[in-house]
Amino acid sequence: MSFVQGLFAARLSRLLHPLLLLVGISLLGDALDIKNSYCKCEEFPIEDRPFVAIWNAPTGGCSVNFSININLRDFDILENPKQTWNGKYVTVFYNAQLGLYPYFTNEQGTNSYNGGMPQLINLAAHLDKMKRDIIKKIPDPDYNGLAIIDWEGWRPTWERNFDSKRIYQSRSVELVQDKHPEWSMENVIEEARKEFERTARVFMESSIKLARQIRPKGLWGFYGFPDCFGSNETNYRCSDDVSKVHH
């Protein structure tokens, strides 16, 4: 099952998380009523549904603070009980919430967490903390909702670390240069690419494998990966060039 991504409306995009398919702004008037919109979760099983829209914006506060209830059941949209950010149907783990994910907080690389680079991480320590983080955030061993790993610091494919993520390429080059100062720049860059992609792949594969072992009924996946980067395509298919990058 793929994760559905969308926006409720452009002007609300900073308030609502872009992981989920949300109803268009034209439906807003119908969605707001005085009825209690909290789902009866047993009415909406996830299994055996080819397409599912799930809401994980923490809009339960709208009812508590403003007496505005957002009714989503009319549109067959699943929501966590009391419309919480994490719950029965969807749980999201961000950079600092799952294990020891390494990343930089700025494109200059002046501030890093857990070494900043997948090449520098202690994988055993990461997996140990990750196990504890999952058990704490998803205490139910039979959890069968979406479990989204939202790691957005870097992308595991070298070519996709462009713009503000270029720091992961440049730091990878520096790591190889420190070990092999006599190498040509061409050889350094090629080795940097190999080392980065190898360690990034091991990091991500080991992480999701462990997650599936701990909560095997959960629908685990990464936010934003793989990505077709095909916003200009009209046939809803990944181009051959993009497909090759992810193989």
Features from the language model and the residues they span:
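Glycan-processing catalytic domains of CAZymes
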Residues: 2-247
